[in-house]
Amino acid sequence: MRDEMRLVIVTMDTHLSSATAMAAARLARQYPGLHLDMHAASEYSADPAALARVKAAISSAHVVLVSMLFLEDHFLPVLDDLKRRRDDLDALICIMSAPDVVKLTRMGRFDMSKPASGPMALLKRLRGKRPGENQGAKGGRSETSGSGASQMKMLRRLPKILRFIPGTAQDIRLYFLSLQYWLGGSDANMESLAGMLVNRYAAGPRQVWQGRLPVAEPIEYPDLGVYHPKMAGRIADQADRLPGMRTTAKPRVGLLMLRSYLLAGNTAHYDGMIAALEAKGLTVVPAFAMGLDARPAIEAFFMRDGRVVVDAVVSLTGFSLVGGPAYNDAQAAEDILTTLNVPYLAAHPLEFQSLADWGGSNRGLMPVETTIMVAIPELDGATSPMVFGGRPGVRGQACQGCH
């Protein structure tokens, strides 16, 4: 009988929770003793019981993956726990997070607390500018435009380059593969991510797990596309495949959505919005882009041959038009909105509290939600901020005040 193997994921919110839960159920069924668990900062930052659960999970974990912990309210409650367990864990993988978190990464010979050397030093020299550097460049699209697509191309290329370099490069390769699996966050990719980390890093009495799990290459999904629940395959790269696109008489609304929610199958709030707009007699163009720069989606699906083909744009992302929690480029957003010259509204799902908490509170949005979801989009030029969805509260209880 194998020793138990515990993988814990700590991340910003719950948008990959359904995909992770499906992956965890399959792994547990096929490999008794293998546990995959996810904890969201949007829950434990405001709930002492949830914080106690994530601390206990980190304490008993063998491999921990941390992702998207940018905000101090999210990473400070667990930072000491991660530091305390760092050297005891089989591996600690920290991606897309605050520098204090990322530098805790330790995967085999790859230790991000040490000065960069060898392959990592070379990659840092090759990486170019980070998103947010030289913001607001004049003359059309800023330097950050299209960064999501270009970074994904590099991310897909790096593991192929590193495959043939021995030593620490193999651990660096798995770090970048972890990013690929995460950004393609379907249940299949989450299952392969867990399998890859177990196969490589299970240590001590858990070494019997090494090499036992089948691992597929990261499944690649479109970086840019459209979505509709009634469309075959749900995701496509051509707007002509959307229902109602052959009708030109109806007003047309462009919706901006997060790709990560779509890949994870966490789409009920989007589906509800699409249905509500269509019930009003509107043709809906729901679009997404890689990363948090919506301009490629706007240019591909809300414009044609330089001509604007939508009558209004509604962002459902909860973020700025160009940027996310770590940065935003209001000038670039202003430029593309000037080109569109149609009404631009920002609606947001509740990310850091449940609908029940929001509806039953005199406060309404939390300060971090007000900043990210209302104030920053207004700098872009968004109007009429509103809540359009979120996580339910206790099962079976209707939300009080959600109207």
Locate predicted features.
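An N-terminal assembly and electron-transfer interface module characteristic of large anaerobic redox
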Residues: M1-H403
